[in-house]
Curated annotation (Swiss-Prot):
Active site, renumbered: C176 (cysteine persulfide intermediate)
PANTHER family associated with the record: RHODANESE-LIKE DOMAIN-CONTAINING PROTEIN 7-RELATED, THIOSULFATE SULFURTRANSFERASE/RHODANESE-LIKE DOMAIN-CONTAINING PROTEIN 2
Domain of life: Bacteria
Protein's name according to its UniProt entry: tRNA uridine(34) hydroxylase
Amino acid sequence: MKDYQILLYYCYTHIADPDAYREEHHLKCLELGLLGRIIIASEGLNGTVSGTEEGCRQYMEYVKADPRFEALEFKIEAHEGHAFQKLYVRVKPEIVHSSLKHVDPTKRTGKHLEPAEFKAMKDRDDVVVLDVRSNYEHQVGRFKNAVTIDMENFRDFPEKIKELDHLKGKKVLTYCTGGIKCEKASAFLLEQGFEDVYQLHGGIIKYGIEQGGEDFEGKCYVFDGRVIADVNKVNPSIISTCYVCGTLSDRMVNCSNPVCNRHEPMCEACGEKMQGACSEECKCHPEKRPYDGTGAYPKELNGYDPYLHVKR
């Protein structure tokens, strides 16, 4: 029974005292029994949390009651239980690490497209659909005919822009998981001379909820315990291949060698054969972890105390 929810959200807005707000926000999450990861910066708020339906309802009311977050939109998905083991509420320089700290999405971004508008535009001849996510994300799922960027992290995006100059005459439709990366990516594209830039409001997750995920090939990589999520209920497919043998597989695993910890698709047969390792070298590594068939190795709680960083 899916009586829990996963919330995904972000909001670019000015937070005068991130440390004070972190304290308040952390306490509210503890009160409501939420787990997850929340980042607070002077430029805004970014989070993904899980909790009971009632806990999530009260949390959304709490956040939306703050005038700074009146424009914030929650993406809500039903789940069987918590999608996280811990709660982290942290202050960082940016709400998503981008190497674009000078870009202010509250001043200028690409035009926001609702999922229905994105669906109507994406296949036009004068349009290019641009995936602004990292390799490990788009290798397991992406929109049909999307242009992908060879980058290990979003902070590499500014250096990759020069490879996209040939697209400047097109309408560029950017997308990412929940919309947050597109805020700065689309703004930076405009800064670099791209004139007609759009972004999928709410990202792949909202598109899956509102449009059934049509033409999203493969699975959506998510940053919680699920790792990948089914978003396409219309014409689903598998596009990722096993890192070891090359057969189709959307089963994401971490290499059982913790020193490597490579995150790649691996079919069940290769998982058993390789004992969860991505190579023979990793299979023989003295620190190799026992493989239980999942390829997931949750971090030990090691005396985790959710009140550890609370000052009052």
